[in-house]
From Swiss-Prot:
Keyword annotations from UniProtKB, A to Z: Carbohydrate metabolism, Glucose metabolism, NADP, Oxidoreductase
InterPro entries (alphabetical): G6P_DH (IPR001282), G6P_DH_AS (IPR019796), G6P_DH_C (IPR022675), G6P_DH_NAD-bd (IPR022674), NAD(P)-bd_dom_sf (IPR036291)
Name of the protein this chain belongs to: Glucose-6-phosphate 1-dehydrogenase
Family matches, as PROSITE patterns: G6P_DEHYDROGENASE
Annotated organism of origin: Bacillus subtilis (strain 168)
Length: 489
């Protein structure tokens, strides 16, 4: 493996002038270069509709990575090239192929090509098919296709898109990116579970009461309103990011730590999810939309007052739900999920609540005890907190809650890789473990479609939670009726 730690490839970015490329892709490639994870045998070709030059792209790259801190920035950006492009014109692909061949000769790259689609999804199928038909993927090295979400709008559209792409690329060449799978603590879920004897035997319905996943954002829709109006929180967050976390939390131990075995176990979880019938949606799921309020003391508008949002919009900006997994390990254990915009804070965390001990001798009027909790902090802080009960200081045998903390990103000297940095490097190495397989995508869409169809038919949603809160009251009621509550810790 060490001989391949500096992969040699040309990275072609479709949508090179866009926001994702500037915010995430260019800084991530730069960090890989700085850290020696890619050497000098690489090139990046940015394609887009704008009539840019190589220098225009290089200046954009410098701006996006705060280049003043890197004295080698010109060496880095010299690897970047721009190619004006029309995705519907076969001639553009032929010209691109000529450029790629030239760059592979210049940088001694063995015909390895990574195509990153960071643009509007309606062009994904066209690009994939034309790359093949014009011979851009016909190389002696490898060709890989990286696809950003959304992968379809529902199961039928996802199936149609997958069929188009599979005409040009095989499944093992397709890397469907979910940046949550690149986050360090999401990847740490498997290690916490399978490398610790104090957790692995307890990770069942015998000892776990419930699992809660919260992914909250304090921002509103910002400049994504046009996309969000078609998507909503269910499609934007639940179908991909949250379903992936559920699968990692619930999967059986894989036979080996390789791509095929891990994906296989995740697929089994998604197959075991209890489907939500349309007449049960209101029992298991809650939706919300933010109205005006304050975030950190600053007034913010309601969703329907945001730019490019219809004043009578029925789009949900909040989702909470109860998921049940019908298998031997998890029967009877609810997985509660919630995600939303304009909430109290930006935070993603997982809370595993363990069951109480039968006839606990320390429950009583003098004791303020909580159940044992394992909290996995995904962002912005990355770490683990374990909540236990211990004896109070003093003579009486009274107990009190205590916590044990580990923070993985609190050390300023530790340069934690960004999610995109890790995923781009994984793709260059051919490691698809942290990318979504088609089976996972299809099963996730199959689960959420009945919910989205029910909500689409019932256009009664109105703003029902204040900006700066943790969501609508109905979200709390979802747990209260089960004798539980959200752990806001």
């Amino acid at each position: 493996m060490k001989t391949n730690q500096q992969p040699k490839a040309v990275i072609v970015i479709f949508g090179a002038t866009g926001d994702l490329a500037k915010r995430k892709l260019y800084p991530s490639i730069h960090r890989l270069y700085q850290n020696g994870q890619i050497g000098e045998e690489f090139a990046v070709v940015g394609v887009g509709r704008r009539p840019w030059s190589n220098e225009d792209l290089r200046q954009t790259v410098k701006t996006s990575i705060s280049s003043s801190a890197d004295k080698h920035i010109d060496d880095f950006t010299s690897h970047f090239y721009y190619h004006p492009f029309d995705v519907t014109n076969p001639g553009s692909y032929q010209e691109l192929n000529v450029l790629l061949n030239q760059l592979e000769d210049t940088y001694q790259i063995p015909n390895n090509r990574m195509f990153y689609l960071a643009m509007a999804p309606e062009f994904f199928g066209t690009i994939a098919k034309t790359l093949k038909s014009e011979g851009v993927t016909a190389t002696t090295g490898w060709s890989r296709l990286v696809i950003e979400k959304p992968f379809g709008h529902d199961l039928p559209s996802a199936q149609a898109l997958n069929k188009e792409i599979r005409e040009a690329f095989t499944e093992d060449q397709i890397y469907r990116i979910d940046h949550y799978l690149g986050k360090q603590m999401v990847q740490n879920i498997e290690v916490i579970r399978f490398a610790n004897a104090i957790f692995e035997p307890l990770w069942t319905n015998r000892y776990i009461s419930n699992i809660q996943i919260t992914s909250s954002e304090s921002l509103g829709v910002e400049d994504r309103a046009r996309y969000y109006e078609k998507s909503g929180a269910l499609r934007d967050m639940v179908q991909n990011h949250i379903m992936q976390m559920v699968a990692l939390l619930a999967m059986e131990p894989p036979i080996k730590l390789n791509t095929e075995e891990i994906r296989s176990e995740k697929v089994k979880v998604l197959r075991a999810l209890r489907p939500i019938a349309k007449d049960e949606v209101d029992e298991y799921f809650v939706r919300g939309q933010y109205h005006a309020g304050e975030i950190d003391g600053v007034p913010v508008p309601a969703y329907t007052d945001e730019d490019n949002v219809a004043p009578d919009s029925n789009t949900e900006t909040f989702v909470a739900g109860k998921l049940l997994i019908d298998n031997f390990r998890w029967a009877g254990v609810p997985f509660y999920i919630r995600t939303g915009k304009r909430m109290k804070e930006k935070s993603t965390k997982i809370v595993v609540q363990f069951k109480d001990i039968p006839m606990n001798l320390y429950y009583g009027n003098e004791n303020n005890m909580n159940p044992n909790l394992l909290v996995i902090h995904i962002q912005p802080d990355e770490g683990i907190t374990l909540y236990l009960n211990a004896k109070k200081l003093g003579g009486a045998a009274h107990a009190q809650p205590i916590k044990l903390d580990y923070c993985s990103n609190c050390n300023d000297e530790l340069n934690t890789p960004e999610a995109y940095e890790k995923l781009i490097h994984d793709c260059l190495l051919g490691d698809a473990t942290n990318f979504a397989h088609w089976d996972e995508v299809a099963l996730s869409w199959s689960f959420v479609d009945s919910i989205s169809e029910t909500w689409a038919a019932n256009k009664t949603l109105s703003p029902n939670y204040e900006s700066g809160s943790m969501g609508p009251k109905e979200s709390d009621d979802l747990l209260v009726k089960d004798g539980l509550h959200w752990w806001n810790i």
